[in-house]
From Swiss-Prot:
<feature type="region of interest" description="Disordered">
    <location>
        <begin position="125"/>
        <end position="154"/>
    </location>
</feature>
<dbReference type="GO" id="GO:0098978">
    <property type="term" value="C:glutamatergic synapse"/>
</dbReference>
<dbReference type="GO" id="GO:0010792">
    <property type="term" value="P:DNA double-strand break processing involved in repair via single-strand annealing"/>
</dbReference>
<dbReference type="GO" id="GO:0003697">
    <property type="term" value="F:single-stranded DNA binding"/>
</dbReference>
<comment type="function">
    <text>E3 ubiquitin-protein ligase involved in DNA damage response by promoting DNA resection and homologous recombination. Recruited to sites of double-strand breaks following DNA damage and specifically promotes double-strand break repair via homologous recombination. Two different, non-exclusive, mechanisms have been proposed.</text>
</comment>
<dbReference type="GO" id="GO:0016567">
    <property type="term" value="P:protein ubiquitination"/>
</dbReference>
<keyword id="KW-0158">Chromosome</keyword>
<dbReference type="InterPro" id="IPR001841">
    <property type="entry name" value="Znf_RING"/>
</dbReference>
<dbReference type="GO" id="GO:0035861">
    <property type="term" value="C:site of double-strand break"/>
</dbReference>
<feature type="domain" description="UIM">
    <location>
        <begin position="189"/>
        <end position="207"/>
    </location>
</feature>
<keyword id="KW-0832">Ubl conjugation</keyword>
<feature type="zinc finger region" description="C2HC RNF-type">
    <location>
        <begin position="86"/>
        <end position="105"/>
    </location>
</feature>
<dbReference type="GO" id="GO:0008270">
    <property type="term" value="F:zinc ion binding"/>
</dbReference>
<feature type="binding site">
    <location>
        <position position="101"/>
    </location>
    <ligand>
        <name>Zn(2+)</name>
    </ligand>
</feature>
<dbReference type="Pfam" id="PF18574">
    <property type="entry name" value="zf_C2HC_14"/>
</dbReference>
<dbReference type="GO" id="GO:0016055">
    <property type="term" value="P:Wnt signaling pathway"/>
</dbReference>
<keyword id="KW-0879">Wnt signaling pathway</keyword>
Amino acid sequence: MSEELSADTSYTEDDFYCPVCQEVLKTPVRTAACQHVFCRKCFLTAMRESGIHCPLCRGSVTRRERACPERAIDLENIMRRVSGSCRCCSKKIKFYRMRHHYKSCKKYQDEYGVSSVIPNVKISQDSVRSSNRSETSASDNTETYQEDTSSSGHPTFKCPLCQESNFTRQRLLDHCNSNHLFQIVPVNLQLDEETQYQTAVEESFQVNM
């Protein structure tokens, strides 16, 4: 792949990955001041979270950029010409087709459990403690409820956002902070924050039954 790049560009393979979701860029956009590139959806989500700063370097971003970021057309064109290796099966794929490949790559599915998503809602330790209370409630009210257990006999849990399973409580927290930090999740405004999280966790338990 380096030979393909060196022929007409100074880009490296890392330049084709979004620094927010850590996946191959999808509809790449570029900041005017610092020239950093992100997936369009990742950038707009980060703007709603952080306001006026670049998600990578905290540089300034104009109001116009926050609403309508400039597409990195030059990078899109290069991604259509240059191939990279799938991170799981090592198959050579054009970068602009890489995310589509992930959806059918069995090794990718086995490794990550779900095709690439943008990632995310940050889950705090307080939320995890809330989930502990919901576990007790679920076990009291559901006669057929049974926790999954790992080979070591400890209970395991399924991520309520991407459905990946076999997490301990701490690994579930780490997974959500790593993979779902900026994911937008539909919110029922009639429920308070703790009730929303408890509902998601209880649904996860029911899937594991």
